[in-house]
Curated annotation (Swiss-Prot):
Phylogenetic placement of the source organism: Eukaryota, Metazoa, Chordata, Craniata, Vertebrata
Protein name stated in the entry: Schlafen family member 12-like
Naturally occurring in which organism (per UniProt): Homo sapiens (Human)
GO annotations of cellular component type: membrane
UniProt key word Disulfide bond: no
Topology of this chain in the membrane: Single-pass membrane protein
PANTHER family (alphabetical): SCHLAFEN (PTHR12155), SCHLAFEN FAMILY MEMBER 12-LIKE (PTHR12155:SF46)
Segments crossing the lipid bilayer: 566-586
Subcellular compartments: Membrane
Family: Belongs to the Schlafen family.
Domain of life where this protein originates: Eukaryota
Pfam family, one: B3R
Alphabetic keyword roster: Membrane, Transmembrane, Transmembrane helix
Gene from which the chain derives: SLFN12L
Classification via InterPro entries: Poxin-SLFN/SLFN_N, Schlafen, Schlafen_AlbA_2_dom, Schlafen_AlbA_2_dom_sf, SLFN_GTPase-like
Length: 588
């Protein structure tokens, strides 16, 4: 690997050091590989971990790495097994890790495969599927809260999507709830609005009696807490984000601190200076909450913080912390969404704006894909790949003499010229395709160039094999001896795989193998590198049927720019005109 590029990647990869996630620079896989460091694996082993904080940190590292790869075209997670004698088939992974995967994914086996290789454990991650109309991005936690009767609960991805879609459709909502017509009072009929009204009266009082019984309980609009004075500041700081988010995203409500489980007024003792500090903490905490607006007004979170005096026989003995939060016009987060991707060769957390863009956009957002080549720049597509789109049209197909009719080479003109100039290449292709039952071999002057990467002028050509019963193979042919082409081939294969999923819309598991051949001036050939002999994939990555071949070819055409699609339309139109002219000529 080029030293400058390697140092660049190492610096950026380790920027996620807080999470202990780095990009593996020495992998043989043509994949984006994230290294999560040492991890204890196995259900019993993880249960026995004395350091609960370490177990939680390992879980977060692995989960965030999975999330990042799901949102970045897929890849592989590499973990060094911490505990000696670990066996995947005997010990499993660990229930806490499994639960994290289940909470993130609709069906884990569709996205993840697990494999132990010696002292290393690999998780193969398929790109997030765009088959359904659900969320377009994987998320560990939306960080959007709502009130569910007496609880503040974080919205799952589906609930968050529905909430955000409604907000987008209506352009936000009014701060004040709609007023309903007054109803005739009915004896013994109680509704939740009665509890909210009683809580409002309680909030507006100036004095409370010690051990006074409440006339209301917790509800959608009321939350009651009681903390010891020693941890009061810490606990209020911890709970404010989720309760403010929940009340603001629902219909507003009240938070009271200083009331016990028996619904009695207890209060907490505090000096005036401490109350001032509590007020500042409340202001700062609410002011830091991320919000996203769908409305034009772009207002702020409306709230009122008070301290209600608690009196025992006329003597002030404490205070009740009272917070009223109005319903918000749009969306209030407790913190940034817990959703990750790989961007600029770093594992990064999405901002609320980026995350919402992915969530509410009806069309998938085609973000910049992570690439090992920090210096590569987008360039125009080369002509051979344009022809590939049309290779199914009979005149553009080419069957190499000596090969089965089921093996198609394309594009025709490019292949003929290539084989006529390089007899050794023609013979090599015949040998390589001998074991292929059915497939398409798509040649290009440079697949790297076709994918928007830099061209290596020392490469003679590339060829992509899409065949039945084996993964796609990217062949690289060159005529420069003692030259290193592994990085070029790996980078091209990795980018191809990512674009098939993120832009092409391919929804199944896929890997791209690489094979590099040297062609001597005398026409002799030698294999310099074969990825298939270097790495092992789970069995599910080798299942390639006739249908998956069609899906791959379709995805491949989708990764090309629109001008190439227009080129296809023009070719088809001309072909149809020719057929019509031909038929009319013979019908005269």
């Amino acid at each position: 690997m080029d030293l400058a590029r390697k140092e660049f990647l190492r610096g950026n990869g380790l920027a996620a050091g807080k999470m202990n996630i780095s990009i593996d620079l020495d992998t043989n896989y043509a994949e984006l590989v994230l290294n999560v460091g040492r991890v204890t694996l196995g259900e019993n082993n993880r249960k026995k971990m004395k350091d609960c904080q370490l177990r939680k940190q390992q879980n977060e590292n692995v989960s965030r790495a999975v999330c990042a790869l799901l949102n970045s075209g897929g890849g592989v997670i590499k973990a060094e097994v911490e505990n000696k004698g670990y066996s995947y088939k005997k010990d499993g992974i660990g229930l806490d890790l499994e639960n994290s995967f289940s909470n993130m994914l609709p069906f884990v086996p569709n996205f993840l495969d697990f494999m132990q290789n010696g002292n290393y454990f690999h998780i193969f991650v398929k790109s997030w599927s765009l088959e359904t109309s659900g969320p377009q991005i994987a998320t560990l936690s939306s960080s959007l809260y709502k009130r569910d009767v007496t609880s503040a609960k974080v919205m799952n991805a589906s609930a968050a999507l529905e909430f955000l879609k409604d907000m987008e459709k209506t352009g936000g909502r009014a701060y004040l709830r709609p007023e309903f017509p007054a109803k005739r009072a009915c004896v013994d009929v109680q509704e939740e609005s009665n509890m909210e009204a009683l809580a409002a009266d309680f909030f507006n009082r100036t004095e409370l009696g010690y051990k006074e019984k409440l006339t209301f309980t917790e509800s959608t609009h009321v939350e009651i807490k009681n903390f010891s004075t020693e941890k009061l500041l810490q606990r209020i700081t911890e709970i404010l984000p989720q309760y403010v988010s929940a009340f603001a995203n629902t219909d507003g409500g009240y938070l009271f601190v200083g009331l016990n489980e028996d619904k009695e007024v207890i209060g907490f003792k505090a000096e005036k200076s401490y109350l001032t500090k509590l007020e500042e903490v409340t202001k700062n905490s609410i002011g830091k909450l991320p919000v996203h607006h769908f409305c034009v007004e772009k207002g702020t979170i409306n709230y009122l913080c008070k301290f209600l005096g608690v009196y025992d026989k006329g003597r002030l003995c404490g205070y009740v912390y009272a917070l009223r939060v109005e319903r918000f016009c749009c969306a209030v987060f407790a913190k940034k969404p817990d959703s990750w991707h790989v961007k600029d060769n770093r594992v990064k957390q999405l901002t609320e704006k980026e995350w919402i863009q992915f969530m509410v956009d009806s069309e998938p957002v085609c973000e910049e894909l992570p690439s090992p080549a920090s210096t590569s720049s987008p360039v125009s597509q080369s002509y051979p790949l344009r022809e590939y789109i049309n290779f199914k049209i009979q005149p553009l197909r080419y069957h190499l003499p000596g090969l089965s009719e089921k093996i198609t080479c394309a594009p025709k003109t490019f292949c003929r010229n290539l084989f006529s100039q390089h007899e050794g290449l023609k013979q090599l292709i015949c040998e390589e395709m001998g074991s292929v039952n059915k497939g398409s071999l798509i040649f290009s002057r440079s697949w790297s160039l076709d994918l928007g990467l830099q061209e290596n002028h020392k490469v003679l050509c590339d060829a992509l094999l899409i065949s039945q019963d084996k993964p796609p193979v990217l062949y690289t042919f060159h005529m420069v001896q003692d030259e290193e082409f592994k990085d070029y081939s790996t980078q091209t294969a990795q980018t191809l795989k990512q674009k098939l999923a993120k832009i092409g819309g391919y929804t199944k598991k896929v890997c791209v193998m690489t094979k590099i051949f040297y062609l001597s001036p005398e026409g002799k050939t030698s294999c310099q590198y074969d990825l298939n002999s270097q790495v092992i994939y789970p069995e599910s990555y080798y299942w390639t049927t006739a249908q998956t071949m069609k899906d791959l070819e379709k995805a491949l055409s989708n990764i090309l720019p629109k001008e190439n699609q227009i080129f296809l339309f023009v070719c088809l139109f001309r072909f149809c005109l020719f057929v019509c002219w031909f038929v009319c000529f013979f019908l005269r």
